[in-house]
Amino acid sequence: MAACVDKWPAAYPCRLPDKFYCALPDCTTTDRPVAPAPAASGSSGDYVWDALRAEAQDDADDEPLLRKFYHDLVLSRPSLESALASLLAAKLCIPGALPQDQLRDLLAGALAAHPEAGRAARADLAAARDRDPACAKMVHCFLYYRGFLALQAHRAAHALWSDNRRAPALLLQSRASEVFGVDIHPGARIGGGILLDHATGVVIGETAVVGYGVSILHAVTLGGTGKESGDRHPKVGDGVLIGAGASVLGNVHIGDGAEIGAGAIVLRDVADGTTAKPIIGKKAEPQRELPGVTMEQRWSD
C-alpha cells in the first residue's frame, strides 16, 4: 500500500498553468507574458499583496478599533507569506503545548521552501474576490474566511508532507480540522484559484487531486469507498463546481468544467463539461461554461 501511495503523485505533478495565474505578476512557472501591475508609491511589485495591504489600510483608517488588529496581522508584515504564517500560527497554536512563535517559524519555513504555495494562495484570494459576491475585499477573505485559511494550512502541511516531514504535516492537518472544521489530508494535491465557500465539513482524502479554478461548497467529501487501498480518492479537473453536501467517492475522474450537483453521490467518472445531478438515474447534462468559475448551479429537466 505504501509503495502505491508513494508512486501516484508522479502522475499528478504540482503545476501552475497560465490560464489561472496570468493575472499574477509574480508567477514564474509560465512563459505567457504578463502585463505588470501599475506602479504605485511603496509598491512591492506583488500585485495581490499590495492590493491586500491597501484594503487593510482603508479599513484601519475607517475603523480606529481595528487599527492595531490590522497593523499586527497585515500592515507590519513584509510579505503575504509572512502575514499568513503569523495569522495561521495565532489560530492553530496550543497555549502551553504548541507555542505560537515556534509554529509560526514552522509555517514560514514551509512556505519559504515551497514558493508555489504562496502563488497558489494569491490565486485563492483572487478567486474569492471574483467569485464570492459576499467578498468585498481580499483582506476580508485573508483574515476571516475559514475556507481560505484551512486551505492555506493545508498548503503548508502539503509542503511538509512533500519534504517527508510527516509528523508536523499531520499536526497541521489535525489543528486545521479542529479549528476550521475542514479536514484535508496533507498528501492531497490541490491547485490554485480554489474557492472553499463556507467550507464547514469539507473532507478531502490523501490521494485526491483537485485542479485549478475549482469551487467547492460546504459539507463536500472527496473520499474513498472504504474497499480500496493505494490511489483511492477522486481526481477533480479544472473549473469544476461541487455543490453543497456532495460526495465523490473512489478513484473516479471529474472532467474539466463539470458540475456536481448539491447532495449528489458520485461513484463513477463524470465527463468534461457535464452536470452530475443529485437525482439517482439522471444522465449527466452538458455545460457550456466553467461552473467552478461562474458559480452557476443549473439543472435542466
Curated annotation (Swiss-Prot):
PROSITE patterns listed in its UniProt record: HEXAPEP_TRANSFERASES
The EC number(s) this enzyme carries: 2.3.1.30
Record pathway: Amino-acid biosynthesis; L-cysteine biosynthesis; L-cysteine from L-serine: step 1/2
Keyword Coiled coil: no
Pfam family, one: Hexapep
Catalytic activity entry: L-serine + acetyl-CoA = O-acetyl-L-serine + CoA
InterPro entries per UniProt: Hexapep, Hexapep_transf_CS, LbH_SAT, Ser_AcTrfase_N, Ser_AcTrfase_N_sf, Serine_acetyltransferase, Trimer_LpxA-like_sf
GO biological process, one term: cysteine biosynthetic process from serine
The protein's enzyme class: transferase
MF terms in GO: serine O-acetyltransferase activity
Keyword Amino-acid biosynthesis applies: yes
GO cellular component: cytosol
Residue segments, region Disordered: 280-301
Keywords in alphabetical order: Acyltransferase, Amino-acid biosynthesis, Transferase
Stretches of the chain forming a coiled coil according to its record: none
Family note: Belongs to the transferase hexapeptide repeat family.
Assembly behavior: Homomultimer.
Protein name: Probable serine acetyltransferase 3
